[in-house]
């Protein structure tokens, strides 16, 4: 089957197998920030934006993305780098394997709710597994990022 989608701002048309996961499609196109973790939608490593909403690309068929926009961390370089610096500053990146999925979900949270409470942050990121147990540092990094963004916008 043939699909056409916009990946990180670039329109792509490809012939794909009907059972191809979106995860495999984006990785085949060089988007290696999207990780294969559990293949069961339990770890958050494969998070991408489908029309600006976070989805787990291991459980989404590429056919579902036909005609839509898909964004990976490669398409959010400036924003992801800004946010990633706050995670690193808190020592929460350790091995870094979980960072892309966690960053994608944290950015989605910030876009949906620019002033989340600590409980809202924890709830939103509950599906992101970190094998190094950096959760507290990640939480502090997110809170610091939000405070910085508000200051950038002149709200503090």
Placement of each model-derived feature along the sequence:
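Signature of N-terminal electron-transfer/Fe-S-associated modules in redox systems
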Residues: 1-156
């Amino acid at each position: 089957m043939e699909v056409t989608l916009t990946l990180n701002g670039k329109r792509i048309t490809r012939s794909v197998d009907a059972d191809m996961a979106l995860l495999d499609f984006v990785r085949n196109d060089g988007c290696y920030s999207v990780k294969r973790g559990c293949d069961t939608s339990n770890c958050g490593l494969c998070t991408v934006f489908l029309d600006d909403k976070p989805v787990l690309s291991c459980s989404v068929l590429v056919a579902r993305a036909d005609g839509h926009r898909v964004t990976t961390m490669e398409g959010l370089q400036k924003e992801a780098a800004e946010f990633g610096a706050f995670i690193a500053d808190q020592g929460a990146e350790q091995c870094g394997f979980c960072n892309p999925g966690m960053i994608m979900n944290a950015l989605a949270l910030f876009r949906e709710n620019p002033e989340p409470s600590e409980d809202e942050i924890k709830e939103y990121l509950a599906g992101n597994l970190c094998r190094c147990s950096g959760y507290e540092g990640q939480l502090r990094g997110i809170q610091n990022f939000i405070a910085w963004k508000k200051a950038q916008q002149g709200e503090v």
